[in-house]
Amino acid sequence: FELRDYQKEAVDGLYNYWAGKAGDNPLIVAPTGSGKTAIIAQIIKDAMSYPGTRVLVVTHVKELLEQGANGLLALYPEADFGIYSAGLGQKVLDRPITFAGIQSVWERAFDIVPAPDLVLIDEAHLLPKNTETRYNRFIADLKTCNPMVKVVGLTATPYRLDSGYLHKGNGAIFDGIAHDIPVAMLMEQGYLSPVISKGGLNQIDLTNVKKRGGEFVESDLATAASDPELVRKTVEEIVDLSADRKSWLVFSSGVNHAYMLKDEFETHDIDVGVVTGSDSSAVREKTIADFKSGELKCLINVNVLTTGFDHPAVDSISLCRATASCGLYIQMIGRGTRVAEGKTDCLVLDFGANVERHGFIDQVKPKDKSAGSSEGEAPVRQCEVCQTMCHAACKICPECGFEFPAPLLNHSSSSYRGAMLSS
C-alpha cells in the first residue's frame, strides 16, 4: 500500500520525534477520516522489518479492535497478528502483532512474552485523567517487563473529552505531539468533506443548566432541551434545512429527549431510529445497519456515536445538545467529515451554541485553567438574516450578502462552504 503525502509525514514525524530524543511516548493527531488505519499499518510494517519486534495495538471497544485488525489485514496481508478480546471470543497473545481490548488485557501484561517493544493506543483521547486507570497500570507493568517500550497514541483530538491535553499534567502517559495533521489542509485538498454550519434559530436555554467537572450536568441539560415547543421547532428546522440531504445524524441531550425528537420526526414522515448506551449490542447494531443501508434517513444517538462510528454518507449533523468539552465537540463534527460519492459537504445545525463556545474546528483548544476562569469569546458571528456561521472579522455574509453592522463577537443561522474553518 502507498501512503498519502500527509500520512507519510505523520509516520516520519513519529520517527523524527524519537530521533530527536524529544521523548518516547508521543501522540499522532489524525483527524477523523484522514486514514489513521493506514498510518498504523505503516508503523507496524516498519516495526516488523526488525526481527523479533513485538507490537501491541490497544483500544477500548471490540468494534474498534475488529476495524483495526481488518484494516491491517487489508493493507498488510502478510501481517502475523492475533486478537486478545473477551468480547470477540479470541485470546491470542503469542503473535508478533496483537490487537487487544484494554478491559481484557490490562491485568495480563506479564503474560505477553516476549514483552512488547511498541504499544499503539487507538482513540487515545478516551484515556481518563485519573492516573490510577487500567491503561496506566497496564503500561506501568509493561515498562517493568521492558523499560524500553515505546507508547504512541493516535487520536483526532490531543485532549480528553472531559479535560485538557493528553500529554500534560501529572501522570500523563504521553510526552508530546509528534505530528498533527491539519484538518483545514485535508478539506482543501479534498481528503475530507467541507463542513458548513448554521446556528439554530431555536437554541437550548442554558440559563439553569449547571456545570460539574467542566461539563454541563446531564440532567439539567436534558430538562432544558426537552421543552416540547423547543423540540417541535428544532425538528421543524432540521427537516427544512436538511431536506436535500441523504443521511442525518442527531446528537440528543438524553434518552427521553431522543425519543421526543423521534416522535416529532415521525410526524414529518421521516424514517428515524434511536441508539442509546443501554441498547443491547444486537439492537444497536441492527439500528446502525438500517441507517447505513438508507432504510433509516435519520439516526438519533445518546452519547454513543461520538467516536469510532464510520458512515461517510452522513451529510447533516444536528447538535441538539450543548457541550463544554472541545474534544466531544470535535468528535461529533468528525462524524460528518468523511468523503462519499455524491456528497459535497456536511451541514452542521447547532442548537446548543457549541460553535460560539468552541470556535472553528481547525482552531479548537481546551481551556487553559491556569490562565484564569474567563472563557472568552470564540471568533465567530452569526448572520441575523440567514444564520450562517461566519468569522468575526467578516463584514459581509458570504451566504446571503448581508452587511454586518459594527463588529460583533457572536453568531446566527445560514451556511457557507468554509463556515467551520478559520480561513
Residue ranges of predicted features:
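Conserved pre-motif I regulatory segment
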Residues: 1-29
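Walker A/P-loop
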Residues: 21-43, 251, 275
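Conserved helicase ATPase core of P-loop NTP-dependent helicases/translocases
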Residues: 83-93, 259-263, 270-302
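Conserved helix-turn-beta segment of the N-terminal RecA-like "Helicase ATP-binding" lobe
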Residues: 63-85
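Conserved interdomain linker/interface between the two RecA-like ATPase lobes of SF2 helicase motors
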Residues: 175-252
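Post-DEXD/H (motif II) to motif III coupling segment of the RecA-like Helicase ATP-binding lobe
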Residues: 129-197
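Conserved RecA-like P-loop NTPase helicase motor core
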Residues: 103-106, 277-365, 370-371
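Conserved helix/coil segment N-terminal to the catalytic DExD/H
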Residues: 87-118, 129
